[in-house]
Regions:
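ATP/NTP-dependent adenylation/nucleotidyl-transfer catalytic domains that generate, transfer
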Residues: 1-396
Length: 396
């Protein structure tokens, strides 16, 4: 749909929603993201105060996000009344002890819809408005990963299971098209241009098992990464947190990387992280190893990398290590034991493919320094060098 007639699309969706809902009430879970915001605005134009907007505070949002989103949506020009549902304990209990990425996503999805079911019953709503877009459907149906907002497309009957019908005004659009619709609707730029945030939130950026400590460290690291990288205008940029590194050195990778870079092996380290991450192989989901690399000077400090040379190493890795889903480069470390944080920044139009940002090394060093200052339990910071594919944008 390259030549989308935005104004016609908006009118068509408003009329379609009116025809389906009539005088019935509908509920929408708003997140502050462009997809749910556009869906809410279109529906509000169709049925007015019969739309109930809720923000589910699942404990996996960024610092201060619930109140910020409520204030943005309820203010001029949108005037969407938003109710915050505090469901932190419910979601933490649901995901407690889970480490597999798909298990976490599916558990989140079930709790998300149970929460919406309860709110819909309370508000006497039989319809749910969702901001599902085409990329969500493509990735779930192809088996790459389960998007939390996909139901009927994978055989789940929302009426039978949760008691409501689902309306998806944007399911034929890609992200860049949704932004075009948002601009035409005069949605403020802080919402229309907001970078995507996954439905399961930080739960899938705490890679592996979720603990309160890891989640707290990640929230602080996320704030720093968004603050430091924002001026470079990535399409999406964020931090993720891992338990740490596996005690295994990859000597062959270290040797081969040194040969490719034409430097001494003494200046290279290669290893892997403990947790596995999601990737894409032959158009399907893969779940594999995250490889780490460090390029050091004679004193053991990291050096400003040459991205063109790094691409050679990356290509070598994915040609020779089929179990690998990602390659990350050490930005900085401290000697104390602790968690590992990775920084990811990509450029993309449709979110089906993405290129890494070749960020200035000084920007990454500054971000790492601030993370160490704010996160006492973090000991290493890496930068993700992996495009999509072979990696997904998110780690889980």
């Amino acid at each position: 749909m390259e030549d989308l007639d935005v104004s016609a699309f908006i009118e068509q969706q408003i009329q379609a929603v009116k025809e389906v809902l009539g005088e019935n009430k509908a509920i929408v879970a708003v997140s502050g993201g462009v997809d749910s915001t556009v869906s809410a605005v279109i529906t509000h134009k169709a049925i007015g105060d019969n739309l109930v907007c809720v923000f589910i505070d699942d404990n996996f949002m960024r610092l201060g996000e619930a109140e910020q989103v409520k204030n943005m949506l309820s203010s001029e020009p949108l005037n969407l009344p938003v109710r915050i549902l505090n469901e932190r304990q419910r979601f933490m209990e649901t995901l407690n002890g889970l480490s597999d990425a798909e298990e976490k996503r599916k558990a989140f999805r079930e709790t998300f819809y149970q929460t919406l079911r309860d709110a819909a019953e309370e508000e006497e709503c039989e319809y749910l408005i969702q901001g599902t877009i085409k990329a969500d459907i493509d990735e779930t149906s192809s088996g790459i990963k389960s998007q939390h907002n996909i139901l009927e497309q994978i055989g789940i009957d929302p009426v039978e299971r949760y008691g409501f019908h689902v309306i998806e005004p944007l399911k034929s659009l890609y992200k860049y098209q949704v932004r075009e619709v948002a601009r035409t609707l005069l949605i403020p730029p802080e919402l229309a241009e907001r970078q995507p945030f996954p439905g399961p939130g930080l739960s899938i950026r705490v890679v592996g098992q979720i603990t309160a400590e890891k989640l707290d460290e990640l929230k602080k690291a996320t704030f720093i990464v968004e603050e430091q990288l924002g001026p470079h205008s990535p399409s999406q940029y964020f931090a993720a947190i891992f338990s740490g590194e596996a005690p295994k050195e990859l000597k062959v990778l270290r040797r081969d990387a040194a040969e490719l870079l034409e430097i001494s092996e003494n200046h290279v380290r290669a290893g892997m992280l403990i947790e596995k991450t999601t990737g894409i192989q032959a158009g399907k989901r893969s779940y594999g190893t995250l490889l780490t690399m460090s390029l050091l000077d004679d004193s053991g400090r990291t050096v400003d990398p040459n991205y063109e040379q790094l691409s050679k190493i990356r290509n070598y890795v994915f040609d020779n290590y089929p179990e690998a889903t990602r390659l990350v480069l050490l930005v900085d470390k401290r000697d104390s034991p602790g968690y590992t944080v990775t920084i990811r920044a990509v450029k993309t139009r449709d979110y089906l493919t993405a290129k890494i940002m070749q960020l200035p090394w000084t920007t990454l060093l500054e971000a790492a320094s601030k993370i160490f200052d704010s996160c006492p339990n973090v000991s290493r910071v890496y930068y993700d060098l992996t495009p999509k594919p072979p990696a997904t944008i998110e780690y889980e």
